[in-house]
Design a protein with these regions (language model features):
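Residues at secondary-structure transition points
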Residues: 1-4, 44, 48, 98
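Aromatic side chains
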Residues: 13-14, 35, 47, 99, ...
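Phosphate-binding glycine-rich loops and adjacent basic patches that engage nucleotide phosphates
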Residues: 14-24, 48-50, 67-71, 90-92
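A solvent-exposed, acidic/Ser-Thr-rich amphipathic alpha-helical stretch
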Residues: 30-79
Length: 133
């Protein structure tokens, strides 16, 4: 796949997420996805495989939100198998707190699927909204 194809995969992933279409999001993930959130928040760590990603990251995170995180792609660059996306995410917790964070994701695309993600974000904001434990 070429650079523009890889960027299209990432755009489709964000668009599906914004629609709340988790089936479409998961269809764009490799079965052996490796997702790393930097830092030491309750949502930090490396999650390998769709089931682990769901059980250990997405379930706990989205379980605390009224709806998903709406993402706006501000910048996207690509080279080879990698796409870097700078995004702004907005969400609200079930108890009414805003969770508006900035993200930089370094994403590896393999055979039309998202194979690896390394996500950088404001960890202090995340901990202040969701707690440290």
């Amino acid at each position: 796949m070429g650079i523009e194809d890889n960027k299209h995969v990432i755009k489709a992933f964000y668009e599906a997420g914004n629609r709340g279409d988790m089936d479409a999001c998961f269809a764009l993930l490799a079965d052996d996805i490796k997702w790393t959130n930097i830092g030491s928040t309750k949502f930090s760590g490396t999650f390998v495989g769709k089931q682990v990603l769901t059980e250990q990251l997405l379930g706990p995170l989205f379980g605390q939100l009224k709806a998903g995180i709406s993402s706006v792609v501000e910048n996207m660059i690509a080279e080879g198998d990698f796409v870097v996306a700078q995004t702004a995410g907005t969400a609200e917790t079930k108890d009414g707190k805003p969770y508006n964070n900035s993200y930089c994701q370094v994403i590896k695309v393999r055979e039309g699927k998202i194979a690896e993600v390394k996500e950088y974000f404001d960890t202090e904001l995340t901990s202040s909204v969701f707690g440290r434990d």
